[in-house]
Amino acid sequence: IRFHEGRFYMVTNNNTTSENFYVYTDDIYGEWSEPITVDQGGIDPSLLFDQGHVYFISNGQDEHGVNSVIQCEIDIETGKKLSPSKPIWQGAGGRYLESPHMYHIGNTYYLVVAEGGTEYGHMVSYSRSDNVWGPFENYPHNPVLTNRNKAPEEIQGIGHGDLVQKADGSWYIMTLGFRQIHK
């Protein structure tokens, strides 16, 4: 979910039809718009609102079939692409690259992704660039958050990170994870 200029946007995918779409509302407790589709495949899509432009980001493959983060610029009113879809990063080397989110903080673009699948190998990795289109520099200490190979930890499968900034300027990360049920 994203909030921009008084409007909430929820972006997701339909696994049955392989379509990506978003809906919006000015009142999070009220009615939402009809789905607006974007002609870009992948799962776990995200939106970046940046300096008058809107970027649609998802996972996909580059021209050689390598898993990559794919991005295009869109018209937020119609969902129509304003640029071709372009691979911008191949991840930090983990399998199942997904859930890309981009943030423009200061003069730097940060790309946060999930890798490793949503089970025990799940992790959060990131890269950065001076340009929204890259090239993106891999953080050398990826993954930045994981409990993989830490069997005694109560919470496992940590990944799919999304950053949240508080009003005081501090940043936090929200992730998913699971706890084993012992019977």
Positions of PLM-derived features:
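Carbohydrate-active catalytic/glycan-binding domains of CAZyme proteins
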Residues: I1-K183
